[in-house]
Structures are given as structure tokens and as C-alpha cells.
């Protein structure tokens, strides 16, 4: 690595609350972890829902248990926890009368959109963390543009955290699809490099494209 730029964006703001639930999808557990831990240290009652396609993609569950009052797990295939999506668990909790001052959702964009679809009708404060494609990290390239409350924002400068109830997720998902071909190329190149280096079958890598880290690939020997 010859160049490094950071930190980008603005610091995360933790709001005053009595009961907060975090919702993490895949690697979203990593940035969610320190936020919920800090809230717990402040005396906030903290719960978390962790989701993944299967058990091996459910991250930091044991670590969350050290300070969260309740840890819920959902997997697409039912290999761990509830079979289904994190939004199924969230909806069930709300329907059973659980009251949350805020929901913090971090994960794939479709997951965060689904969370907002649950919380918006209930007018529950919802924070999301956006990490779309970024090239220069200064807002000049415009790749990470997102509409929030009808205003243009840039995730690298104004984010990554935004009011989820105000994010135009449909536009965001459309813009992300614009770079699928480039992401596929990066993934294929990474696989070839892993093969050349003889990386083991278990190795998993997060590939940085510009200043973004959204493309995940498994190296195969």
C-alpha cells in the first residue's frame, strides 16, 4: 500500500436513548459493534439482531452477548437462529410490544431498506450506514451520491451515517447497479491473484475498490 486517505466522512453521533436495537447484516456487525458497546457503557439498554445467509456469516455474536441484553440471530437457511431475515425478527419484536427509541441498521443496502420499511410506519428513529462505491473519497467523483430528504449528499463526505427514514433507497440501489461490471472484474482479478499465491480455500478477503470495501470474494486454490 503506497497511499492511504482517512478518516473520511463525519464521526458517528450516538443519540440519547433508553432502549436501542442494532440490526446487522454480514460484515455490518463490525461497525455496529463499537456503537452498541458505547451505548451500553452509557447505561442504554441495547439489543441486537444479527443476520447472515448461513451460520458462518453471522459475525461477533459472542462478543455482542457481553453487553447486549438480547442477541437475536437470523439466517436465510435456518442454520443458526431464526430461519428468515433480520426484518422478520424486528417485526415480531415490535408486534409483541417491544418499544425502541432508535434502530441502528448496518449491512447490505436491501437489508437497510427493508429495516426502514418496518420502522417508518411506526415512526421509529432509524440510523443507517451507507458505503456505496467511492473513488476519491472527497465528493468530487460523485459515485457515492445519495438523496436524503430530497437533498443530494455524498457518503464519503456527509456520511456514512444518515437518517434512514429520509434516504432514497430506490435511487441508491439503482446507482449501485451501475458498477456491477467493474465489481465483477475486481472480484475475478482477486480470485486469480489468490490462485497464483496459493491462498487456502478458507481464506476470505474484502477487496478495496478505490476507497470502498464492498466487494467480497472467496479465494479458491
Regions from the PLM with identified roles:
Residues 116, 139, 167-168:
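Short acidic, glycine/serine/threonine-rich loops at helix termini
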Residues 9, 13, 131, 135, ...:
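Generic, ordered loop/turn and secondary-structure boundary motif
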Residues 29-31, 109-110, 131-161, 190-205, ...:
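Local cysteine-cluster metal-coordination motifs and their immediate loop/turn environment
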Residues 1-135:
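FNR/FR-type flavoprotein reductase catalytic core
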Residues 14-19, 41-45, 61-70, 93-95, ...:
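Iron-sulfur (Fe-S) cluster-binding modules
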Amino acid at each position: 500500500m503506497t497511499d492511504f486517505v482517512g478518516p473520511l466522512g463525519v464521526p458517528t453521533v450516538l443519540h440519547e436513548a433508553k432502549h436501542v436495537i442494532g440490526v446487522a447484516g454480514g460484515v455490518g456487525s463490525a461497525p455496529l459493534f463499537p456503537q452498541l458497546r458505547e451505548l451500553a457503557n452509557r447505561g442504554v439498554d441495547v439489543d441486537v439482531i444479527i443476520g447472515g445467509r448461513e451460520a458462518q456469516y453471522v459475525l461477533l455474536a459472542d462478543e455482542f452477548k457481553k453487553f447486549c441484553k438480547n442477541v437475536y440471530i437470523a439466517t436465510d437457511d435456518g442454520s443458526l437462529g431464526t430461519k428468515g431475515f433480520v426484518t422478520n425478527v424486528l417485526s415480531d419484536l415490535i408486534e409483541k410490544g417491544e418499544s425502541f427509541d432508535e434502530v441502528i441498521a448496518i449491512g447490505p443496502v436491501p437489508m437497510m431498506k427493508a429495516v426502514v420499511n418496518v420502522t417508518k410506519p411506526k415512526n421509529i428513529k432509524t440510523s443507517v450506514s451507507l458505503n456505496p462505491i467511492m473513488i476519491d473519497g472527497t465528493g468530487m467523483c460523485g459515485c457515492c451520491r445519495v438523496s436524503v430528504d430530497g437533498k443530494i449528499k455524498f457518503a464519503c463526505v456527509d456520511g456514512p451515517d444518515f437518517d434512514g427514514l429520509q434516504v432514497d433507497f430506490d435511487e441508491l440501489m439503482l446507482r449501485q447497479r451501475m458498477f456491477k461490471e467493474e465489481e465483477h472484474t475486481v472480484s475475478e482479478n482477486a480470485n486469480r491473484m489468490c490462485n497464483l499465491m496459493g491462498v487456502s480455500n478458507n481464506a476470505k478477503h474484502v477487496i478495496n475498490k478505490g476507497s470502498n470495501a464492498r466487494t467480497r470474494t472467496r479465494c479458491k486454490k
